[in-house]
Swiss-Prot record:
Name of protein: Protein PERCC1
Alphabetical list of InterPro entries matching this protein: TEADIR3_omega_loop
Biased composition (Low complexity): 74-83
Disulfide bond residue pairs: none
Organism: Homo sapiens
Lineage: Eukaryota, Metazoa, Chordata, Craniata, Vertebrata
Length: 267
């Protein structure tokens, strides 16, 4: 009987009771008397008056409090003191560099060695020489003064005057060809004897601009399908024949001897 009457509570499906916390979530402020509220209001008014006096001190620079607040204020990147500090720092760095790496006298440092003692200052800079040449050419003159004498050099080593006009620059045996090809631009500076010497030596040579070159001179070697150049030797027999038929004594042989020497090479 008792076992059939007694059943667990979960079978009755009773509503669960909610347990409230002991402490409220929003505690109410403690009740204060009117005297305490008046004291708090007076303290707040005094603090506001103190802040107002501090602001006036910042506005009036004559007061001591204003100076104290200005000194206590942090200096930002936009303050006027920042450039002055950077300038002082750069001056200190430059002084240190001059002290350790600059020129020193024997009195300051007995072991000092002047590395600039053997150097010679240049007479004129490259820019000055460049502009001087441009001005001289614009006025219709030559790159050299007319009174400049021809340089005396040993035989076989011809010197051509430089653009700056300060000294002659040796160019080797090819300088004669340059002098012969550019003598028309020298003007009255070229000596008559020197021009005649060049004319006798190189006047019989036909310039490349006046020669009739064969097609092989303008034909480039064609690459093979693999991207490599043809291993065979290019055929310049027509070029050699055209040069040998001309009356050019600079070649060792003329006409038939040159062709005969070229045919065995082809074979």
């Amino acid at each position: 009987m008792a076992a059939g009457v007694i059943r667990p509570l979960c079978d009755f499906q009773l509503p669960l009771l909610r347990h409230h916390p002991f402490l409220p979530s929003d505690p109410e402020p403690p009740e204060t008397s009117e005297e305490e509220e008046e004291e708090e209001e007076e303290e707040e008014e005094e603090e506001g008056e103190g802040e107002g006096l501090g602001g006036c001190g910042r506005i009036l620079p004559s007061s001591g409090r204003a100076e104290a607040t200005e000194e206590a204020a942090p200096e930002g990147p936009g303050s006027p003191e920042t450039p002055l500090q950077l300038l002082r720092f750069s001056e200190l760095i430059s002084d240190d560099i001059r002290r350790y790496f600059g020129r020193k006298d024997k009195g300051q440092d007995p072991d000092a060695c002047d590395v600039y003692a053997d150097s010679r200052p240049p007479r004129s800079t490259a820019r000055e020489l460049y502009y001087a040449d441009l001005v001289r050419l614009a006025r219709g003159g030559s790159l050299e003064d007319e009174d400049t004498p021809e340089p005396r050099v040993p035989q076989g080593q011809v010197c051509r005057p430089g653009l700056s006009g300060d000294r002659a620059q040796p160019l080797g045996p090819l300088a004669e060809l340059f002098d012969y090809g550019l003598q028309q631009y020298w003007g009255s500076r070229a000596a008559a004897g020197w021009s005649l010497t060049l004319e006798r030596k190189y006047g019989h040579i036909t310039p490349m601009a006046q020669r009739k070159l064969p097609p092989s001179f303008w034909k480039e070697p064609t690459p093979s399908p693999l991207g490599l150049l043809h291993p065979g030797t290019p055929d310049f027999s027509d070029l050699l024949a055209s040069w040998s038929t001309e009356a050019c004594p600079e070649l060792p042989g003329r006409g038939t001897p040159a062709l005969e020497g070229a045919r065995p090479a082809e074979a």
